[in-house]
Amino acid sequence: MLDIKFVRDNPDAVKENIKKKFQDAKLPLVDEVIEKDAKYRECLKEVESLKAARNKLSKANGPLFGQLKKCDDEAKKAELQAQIDANNAAVKADADKMAELEAEEAKLAERIQEIMYTIPQMIDPSVPIGPDDTYNVEAQRFGEPVVPDFPIPYHTEIMESFDGIDMDAAGRVAGNGFYYLLGNIARLHEAVLAYARDFMIDKGFTYVILPFMMHGNVVQGVMSFPEMDAMMYKIEGEDLYLIGTSEHTMIGRFIDQTLDEATLPLTLTSYSPCFRKEKGAHGIEERGIYRIHQFEKQEMIVVCRPEESADWYEKLWKNSVELFRSMEIPVRQLNCCSGDLADLKVKSCDIEAWSPRQQKYFEVCSCSNLGDAQARRLHIRVKGKDGKTYLAHTLNNTCVAPPRMLIAFLENHLQADGSVTIPKVLQPYMGGLEVMVPVHKK
């Protein structure tokens, strides 16, 4: 979310940014919010003026009451009483006018906030311009893509060969978008999460166990309305939502806080289940675990000073690359274009893993710099050495999300005989197992 003062002072830049994000329908909102803000500030000014007048009249009545009490002249007493009554009438009139203005002020403030929540964050100059993800730009590749000389089955078929997945039972229990993982596949899932946790701790991040639900004001603080509608499950009858990712409550931890600058940067990592409706263009897969309603994830976030966020952005996505390469999975970095950025994001990139079966890359991680957008909504401020406060910057990045990571892992480590090799970094988390041998060979 932008600062209203910035919008007031830079309307053309804000409009140009909206055009770069291909959201032209929002252009009239810039002029509307500037107009509403001017009216809001005029209301504030009038209210303050009326308060001053009311206080002056109320103060004037004090001496008049004193004179009235001491006065013996009936004519003079009547004159004093008339002045007191006139002052009281003026005070009441001012109070009535103030009530009207304050009601208008509240109405304007609500609309201003609604618009400000809709106007997108200013994107970084380095962001590629394009309307959708087909305009995302490959930046770098890491590792040589695997080109197998044998056919790679669909990932659920690989899992089924290990008796490792039961989607039919999950469908009977909860419908599409859920799964049971079993045996070595379930063990591999947990091994990846445990390894990712230790990997991030070794990077100096603090491990966090956090709430898996949050209040509506936190939801509005961490994401845009379209994201909220497409993703979040609400608990019926409660002001609670299931988290779509652990970054939500990791960032939410600092709502309405003023942080000591000396404590920054705050670098946190957490495991959590994630719950998503997955409404929209992609939806839930009829089969497979690429896009589902419930999954687990290891996440990383940073709360830092504004001048540090660009450097942390680079560090975060490189953590994901290093993690995947340590598990011998080829990946690439893809810079997200303007139209593919959520409204709160300043800059974002995807880390995509190589799929030997499809002979193409697919998204496994997403890294984002949100600038001061979340901090402004959640009121996360920093107190500097000079005593002045300013808004923090926040960033987040997927460390690993095992459902998608498992797809990449199984395809890249599948052998011609149907077995799956375990990289050395994961073997301690798999009880020393070096190779997973299928139960059913096809």
How would you name each of these model-derived features?
Residues 1-145, 160, 164:
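N-terminal alpha-helical targeting/anchoring segments
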Residues 27, 141-442:
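TRNA-recognition modules of translation machinery and tRNA-sensing kinases, especially anticodon-binding
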